[in-house]
Structures are given as structure tokens and as C-alpha cells.
Amino acid sequence: MDFLTSSDFWFLTGTSLAKTIFLIFLVVLPMVSYTVYAERRVSALIQDRVGPNRTGFPTSLIPGVTKDWSPFLGGLGQPVADAVKFLLKEDFVPGHVNKLYFWLAPCLAMMPAIVTLAAIPFGSEFLGVKMVVADINVGLLFMFAISSVSVYGIVLAGWSSNSKYPFLGGIRSTSQMISYELCMGLSAVPVLLVCGSTKLSAIVGYQVREGWLLAPFTDGGLSVREIALWVPIIIAFITFTISMFAETNRLPFDLPESETELVAGYHTEYSSMKFALFFLGEYTAMIAGSALIVVLFLGGWHLPFIPDGAGQGGLTFLHAIPSWIWGLVNITAFFAKVAVLLLVFIWVRWTLPRFRYDQLMKLGWLYLFEIALVNIFLTAGILAFTK
């Protein structure tokens, strides 16, 4: 009871609330909006089109600005226009749907993706505050557990629509997401064996000391152990990334939507903001998946030879610069890595064709599952012989 009335309790509560608001309203929503915009521009570039390049901001309304610069902003106002469009569209609910579950499904599809971000450390420290909402010991297991709930939203959307196409999309998503969750979990085990922790900040801390798992030379040197572990880590990275594509229903794994076969799959009957929630959930899951890959394999917020937000590590002469500046650098580095991975998601979507359903299951169960399982024993053997 004394803790509840102490200043430490209110400090932790206040900083956690501030980090949550920052993460949702200043990171997730803008990143989702401009990831959609980036996808439309990149797809246009790949297909030799122009893409959205007209919608801007009326800069002439700003006091002191006489010229309208909106045509030169390259369509950067398009996400705002899209948001307004979704808000103003009629929220039509077909008469044949099961209304309770029809309304519940978009929330179940979106919320897990946002909640998983709570365990992601997106920086070291900033002004003495850890840049993670919930620095829990079971961070990786927490992310796997919460992200698995999103399949219920997709299944409910397909079932409650009382329509053949959404139902088929929901059934596909069930088998696909459950199959690839297993592969994704097994792919993460070598990282846990090497780092010795399921706490995400501890995994990043290991990479700060020993070098990124995918690029161990970033600590300034290479040992025999690091060279030997490099092979299973690369295998784990490949299988984990492929599984993440399948978990987020992105091409070439978008069988639950599959526009050429199922119209729009599980969200065929949805419109307006309920459709936008599915959209938001998909892109938030992409951000969470990219962030998890950065944490597990790419050193999290760490940049080689750069101190963290607490003034630890890095080159000695850089410690003369205030630590809060390095805290900002760490946060920027983390989200820059996430942005690069998001571009990879977009690039792959507009490059590779969709798998057939039998090919999807064959890849997951006959290849990725066995490779991830053998890779665990390979990692354990290397750790045992190089101890």
C-alpha cells in the first residue's frame, strides 16, 4: 500500500502513460498512414506509374506564406485525405451478418498488434526514462502470445459475415497463421539460446556488448564462437522473416484476402471505419513484426561505436556530448531500421506472385518447420562445443 502512495509509483504510472500515448499517436498512427502512402508510391514506381502525387497541404493558408507549395509536396497529404474518406463513408452493415461478432472482429484484429508494441524497447534511455512501455522478463513470449489472438478477429470476421468468400478467407487464415506461428517460434529459439533471455531489452543489451546477431562484427571484432554461430543465426533470420510475412498476411502469403479468388477475403462485407480497423491492424502488425526483427537480429536501437541514452558504451570522446542526444539518436536509429524493413515488406509484395494454398502449407510444414527445428540443435551444438 505504501508503494501505491509513493512518488515512484506515480512516476512509473505517468511515464508509462506518456510512452503509451507517444507510441500510439505519434509513432504507430503516423507510421501506418505513411507506410500506406509509401506502398502506393513504391508500387507505382515498380509498375511504371505516377501514384498519388497531388494531395498536399494548403500552405497558402499559413500566415506569411503567399505561395501554395502543396503541388510540390508529392502527395504527402494523401493519408489525411484517406482518413477523412474512411470517417465520412457510410458504415453499412448487411442484414445477413451476425451483428455482435461482426462488430467485435475488427477490434480483435487491431488491438493485439498495438498491445504487442508495449514490450518492444524502441530506445535505450531518454532523460533517465527507459524507452519501453513494459520491460517484462517474458517479452518475447508475451509478443507471441498476444499476436496469436489476432487470428480470432479474422476468423470471426469470416464466420460472422455469413458469406462464402469471407468464410473461406477466415478458414484459410486459421490454418496459415497457426502453422507459421509454430515456425516463427522455433526460429526465435536460437536467439534465446545465444542471448540467454526472453527479455527483449536484455537481447538488445547482449547485441550492444557482443555485436548484432546478424552482423557480429559491429562490436569491433570477431571470435571463433561468433563466426560459428553466424550460420544458424542467418538461417533463423531467414525462416523468422518468412514466417513474419505469413503471419501478417502479406504477399506472397495473402491467401486469407486473395483478391483474385475471394474478392477481399474475410473483410469483403466490411466498409467505412470497420474496414479501416482491419487495414490499421495489418499495417500495425507489419510495424510490430519489423520492430521484433530489429530487436532480435539487428541490434535494436544500437549503432556501432555510438553511446546509448545513459552515456554507456561507444567511443570515449563521444561521452562529452549530453546523453539525452544519444537517447534521441538511439530512437531514430531504431525506427530507421524498422522503416527499411517496412520497405522490404512493400518491395516483396509487389515483386513476388501469390502461393497456391497447397504450396503455402507445404512450405510451412515440409520446409520451414524442419529447417527451424534442425537449426535449434545446430545452435545448441555450437554453443556446447565453443563454451
Residue map of PLM features:
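Selective transmembrane helix interface/packing segments
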Residues: 1-387
